[in-house]
C-alpha cells in the first residue's frame, strides 16, 4: 500500500463507523462543493480542495516521501519532532527495517488548523439523542468559534517541517479513529445492557486497552453520579467530533431524557454543568480510547502484512491475533 492508500482506507473506515448515515456525509460534501463553485476565481485559488472530498479535514497526508509499498509504520497518539527523529534513528540503525511512514492520531499541520471544521458532526449526534437541531447547532457554533480561535496561534507545521527535512512520510488520522472507538464502545454497551452506572465501568474494564490503562492509573472513572445510580438513557456524545462541545449542552441533554454520558475526557467546567443537570458522567479514558480506535484501524494494516511499531502512548492490542 502507498501512504495515500493507507490514508484513504482510514477515511473509508471513518465513514463506515460514523454515527451519521453515509448519505448525510455525502450531502455535506456536496454542499461544500456547491459553495466552492460560487466562489470568485481568486478565492478558489486559496480554497483547500481536499475539503470537498475528505469529510474529516482534521486528518490528512502531511508529507509523502513517495514510497510505493509501505512495509513498516510507526504509530503514536501524539507525534512531534522527537518522534520523527526516533523514526529516522530506527531507520538508520536498521536499514533492512526502515520506518516507511509515521502515523499520528491527534491533528498536526493543516489538520490542526482545521480542527474546528469537524465539530459540526456533534450537532448531528446531539440531534440523534433528542436535542433539537437548532439548539445543538446554536450551542456548537459558539464552541466551534472558540476552538477556531484557540488553535489559531499554534505553530501548526513544526512537525510537518521536520518530516520533510527527514524525508519520512507523515499522516494523521483523528476523527475517523474517534468514530471507530465510539462505534466499538456503543456496540459493547448495547450488548451488555448495563442497568447501573457501576455496570458501565465493569463493562469497559473488559476491554484490554482500558484494563491496561487502569493498571497505569488512567482507567475508566466516574466524574459525576454514583455507581449505584441507574443509567437511564445512555449517550455517547463526547467521544468523536473534534474536541469538547459546549458546556451548556448538558441541560438540553437532560431535558431530552439522557441519564448517562460516556466520554473520553472532560474539563472541570463541563463536569460541573453535567452535575447540575444530574447526568452521570463516565469517562472511559482519553489515550486508552484513542488506542482502541487506532488498534481497530491498525488491525487492517496488519492483515495486509504491514508491521506496526507503536510509540507515544499507543497501547497496541491486536485483535487479528486474538481471532486465531
Please report, for each region that a protein language model flagged, where it lies by residue.
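Active-site catalytic microenvironments in core metabolic enzymes, especially phosphate/sugar-handling
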Residues: 1-324
Amino acid at each position: 500500500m502507498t501512504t495515500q492508500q493507507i490514508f484513504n482506507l482510514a477515511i473509508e473506515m471513518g465513514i463506515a463507523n460514523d454515527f451519521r448515515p453515509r448519505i448525510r456525509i455525502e450531502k455535506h460534501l456536496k454542499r461544500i462543493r456547491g459553495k466552492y463553485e460560487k466562489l470568485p476565481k481568486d478565492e478558489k485559488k486559496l480554497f483547500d480542495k481536499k475539503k470537498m472530498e475528505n469529510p474529516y479535514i482534521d486528518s490528512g497526508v502531511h508529507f509523502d516521501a513517495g514510497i510505493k509499498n509501505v512495509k513498516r509504520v510507526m504509530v503514536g497518539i501524539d507525534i512531534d519532532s522527537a518522534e520523527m527523529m526516533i523514526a529516522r534513528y530506527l531507520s538508520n540503525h536498521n536499514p533492512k527495517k526502515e520506518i516507511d511512514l509515521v502515523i499520528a492520531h491527534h491533528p498536526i499541520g493543516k489538520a490542526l488548523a482545521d480542527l474546528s471544521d469537524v465539530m459540526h458532526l456533534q450537532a448531528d449526534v446531539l440531534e440523534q439523542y433528542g436535542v433539537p437541531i437548532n439548539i445543538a447547532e446554536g450551542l456548537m457554533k459558539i464552541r466551534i468559534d472558540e476552538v477556531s480561535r484557540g488553535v489559531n496561534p499554534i505553530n501548526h507545521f513544526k512537525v510537518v517541517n521536520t518530516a520533510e527535512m527527514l524525508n519520512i512520510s507523515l499522516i494523521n488520522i483523528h476523527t475517523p479513529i474517534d468514530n471507530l472507538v465510539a462505534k466499538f464502545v456503543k456496540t459493547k454497551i448495547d450488548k451488555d445492557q448495563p442497568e447501573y452506572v457501576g455496570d458501565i465501568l465493569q463493562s469497559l474494564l473488559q476491554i484490554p486497552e482500558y484494563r491496561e490503562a487502569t493498571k497505569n492509573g488512567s482507567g475508566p472513572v466516574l466524574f459525576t453520579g454514583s455507581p449505584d445510580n441507574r443509567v437511564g438513557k445512555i449517550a455517547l456524545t463526547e467521544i468523536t467530533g473534534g474536541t469538547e462541545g459546549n458546556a451548556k449542552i448538558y441541560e438540553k441533554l437532560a431535558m431530552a431524557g439522557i441519564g448517562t454520558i460516556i466520554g473520553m475526557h472532560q474539563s472541570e467546567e463541563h463536569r460541573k454543568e453535567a452535575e447540575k443537570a444530574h447526568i452521570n458522567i463516565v469517562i472511559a479514558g482519553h489515550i486508552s480510547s484513542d488506542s482502541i480506535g487506532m488498534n481497530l484501524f491498525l488491525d487492517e494494516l496488519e492483515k495486509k502484512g504491514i508491521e506496526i511499531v507503536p510509540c507515544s502512548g499507543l497501547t497496541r492490542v491486536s485483535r487479528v491475533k486474538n481471532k486465531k
